[in-house]
Regions:
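Short, mixed-charge low-complexity intrinsically disordered segments
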Residues: 192-239
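Active-site neighborhood of HAD-like aspartate-dependent phosphohydrolases
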Residues: 1-39
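Short, electropositive alpha-helical surface patch
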Residues: 48-71, 93-106
Length: 240
């Protein structure tokens, strides 16, 4: 609340799960960054106090995650956790960094990509500024060990045009041109033109190309769960 969504009522805290609208200006800024991951953390102590039922809040939370994932694209992982507890000592209640630490570790486990805490940026609306209800987001960033921006400052920033690289879908390797120069640090329009040229020059279905953000890395193959052995089932009809 206040960072990715706002209340329609204009109140600091929503009157119900229906009292929300997406902050598309924040969505747009996040998309320009092309981050490897967007990890959403939210204190929801109202659940423990009985103000909102978890069965009502969870679909709202999932909806916001799904909206951002759909908008920002599949090259960025969007995930989230919320803390329903009010105990200030609970490791997952902001300003404690437990939720961020859990999700960053899970991201590394699932993708094989390691992101250092100092390379992360936290964006929030509880920055301790005049008129704000708290500084819990700012303190969370400090406790986690990453940089911080208030959401208003973030949306007002002039961000540079994102850059891309062209890769082979078969192995994720960056494609090189005829002069052996890697096709990277391209604008989106330049990358699109390069992909179109490569697809026309290589019509074979096994040669497919696309462009991805410069920060994109090839994720590792997910661990294969053990498969049960096939069993032959003999159906013995019951004798009459």
């Amino acid at each position: 609340d206040g960072t990715l969504i706002d209340t329609v009522s204009g109140k600091t805290f929503p009157e119900g799960v229906w009292d929300m609208e997406l902050k598309m200006e924040v969505f747009a800024q996040l998309k320009k960054l092309h981050p490897q991951a967007v990890l959403i953390v939210s204190n929801q102590g109202g659940i423990e106090l009985g103000h909102v039922h978890p069965a009502m809040f969870q679909p709202k939370f999932i909806y916001v995650i799904a909206c951002l994932q759909s908008y920002i694209g599949l090259n960025t992982l969007v995930a989230g956790q919320f803390c329903p507890y009010n105990d200030k000592k609970h490791p997952k209640r902001k300003p404690n960094p437990g939720m961020l630490e859990d999700m960053l570790a899970e991201f590394t486990h699932n993708t094989g990509i390691t992101i250092a805490k100092e390379d992360c940026l936290m964006i929030g609306d509880a920055s301790g500024l005049e008129g704000q209800f708290s500084d819990s987001d700012l303190k969370t960033a400090e406790n986690f060990g990453c940089d911080y921006l208030d959401v208003t400052e973030f949306t007002n920033m002039e961000l540079p045009e994102p850059l891309f690289k062209v890769i082979r879908l078969s192995d994720g390797e960056v494609v090189k041109d005829k002069d052996d120069n890697p096709l990277q640090n391209l604008t989106e329009s330049e990358a699109t033109d390069k992909v179109v040229f490569l697809m026309e020059a290589n019509p074979e279905p096994q040669e497919q190309f696309t462009y991805v953000p410069m920060l994109w890395e090839v994720p590792h193959e997910p661990e294969q769960a053990p498969q049960p052995k096939e069993k032959i089932i003999h159906m013995n009809p019951k004798k009459q």
